[in-house]
Amino acid sequence: MSTIEQNLIGNTAGLSRVDKVLRYFFFALLIGTIVYSIGGTFFGRDNRLNDYGLADAALLLAVFIPGYSRHIPGAHRALRACEWVVMACSLVSTAAVIVGDVTDHGVRPEPYNMPWNVAMGAGLVAFCFFVVLLIAKERARRRGLVPPAR
């Protein structure tokens, strides 16, 4: 199986039902924010693509995170907790961007307002915990615990 095939949303071999539901939930949320941000650019008062781009990046991480550590034999609960932290931070980032969009009524406020700072912080935390998961999976792959196709 190629790297592209393993990252498709439909490839859910070895995942639990909860992981599948979470993947589809975050995928639907990602599509919704993309459509809303593009629609808001054409029909809104202000261009919010920067803000929604941040939320979309965090959601893109969250789409592939559920079940990420399941393929690692003997994975600790800490890795599963890292998955949940990434998912929670992406939700916080998305919520902060939406709150910032609603509270300024479509008019761009100062560049670094509170919702933007919260969204950036949550996105940074999500990225850091994703890197922890990525390193754990690569270390397991180098030890020979995970086949290269996963």
Give the location of each predicted region.
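Cytosolic juxtamembrane helix and N-cap/initiation of the first transmembrane helix
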Residues: M1-G32
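Membrane-interfacial loop-to-transmembrane-helix junctions in polytopic alpha-helical membrane proteins
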Residues: N11-V21, R45-R48, H71-C82, R108-P115
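Alpha-helical membrane-associated segments of multi-pass integral membrane proteins
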Residues: L22-L29, T33, S37, D104-R150
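Residues within membrane-spanning alpha-helices of integral membrane proteins
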Residues: R23-L30, A57-L60, E83, M87-S90, ...
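Interfacial non-cytosolic loop connecting adjacent transmembrane helices
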Residues: F42-G53, T94-M120
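Generic alpha-helical transmembrane segments
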Residues: R48-G67
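Alpha-helical transmembrane segments in multipass membrane proteins, preferentially the mid-helix core
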Residues: L61-H71, F130-L134
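Loop-to-transmembrane helix junctions at the membrane interface
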Residues: I65-A95, V99
